[in-house]
Amino acid sequence: MHGFKGNLGYDDSKILYALSHYLNQQGISTLRFDFDGTSHSDGEFKDMTVFSEILDGMKIIDYAHTTMQAKKIYLIGHSQGGVVALMLAAYYSDIITKLVLLAPAATLKDDALKGVCQGSQYDPNHIPETVDVHGFTVGGDYFRTAQLLPIYETAQHYSGPTLLIHGLADNVVSPEASKKYNVIMPNSELHLIPGEGHMFNGSRRQEILKLVANFLKN
């Protein structure tokens, strides 16, 4: 599950594209998609919220579980997609076998309370109808709902095996977010990768791909 302003990954520069193809080579089937309002999906980006992405994710889980009849379902989320994936794993703890979180953006709630979003600023007490974030029109409902998201509270309801990977050079989402997840989720393991940024485009990407594959296979 991709992050804020992201997509499912259409070339090898994107971590989800690289990870999907690597897992396929390891015999693990993958299902990637664009959230509603992003890239090739229908809808408007300004209507996107974490809740709308959770609803999208529910449809994907239903498709994998009911239509594809997958015996095991693993969720992988990057950045905001990590927040969505974890909340879905908690909601579907009886279905989701394992969870992988890549630089999960739990800090989006703190940012919304401060009135900041990737460099853009707004009044958090009087949220405007829309906010421009690097050329993307983000609806006010995104920030209103983000301020009250029960991110860590929900995380405590998933007890399945969880892999947390965060780059120590991430200047978008602080590694402290993954550290906190690791503390409140006793069945989780945390890998902090020196030199890797938020997009995992550094020299240690292959190591990250292997970490995920080994975690899912074992």
Residue ranges and their predicted role:
Residues 23, 88-89:
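Aromatic pocket-lining residues of Rossmann-like dinucleotide-binding sites
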Residues 68-79:
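Alpha/beta-hydrolase fold nucleophile elbow
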Residues 34-48:
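Glycine-rich "HGGG/HGxG" loop immediately N-terminal to the catalytic nucleophile
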Residues 10-12, 41-45, 112, 175-176:
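Conserved catalytic-core motifs of eukaryotic protein kinase domains, centered on the activation segment
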Residues 1-25, 30-34:
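Short, surface-exposed "cap/lid" segments of acyl-processing enzymes
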Residues 74, 83, 90, 95-180, ...:
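The alpha/beta-hydrolase serine catalytic core
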Residues 47-67:
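Alpha/beta-hydrolase active-site loop
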Residues 5, 35-39, 106, 197:
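Alpha/beta-hydrolase active-site loop signature
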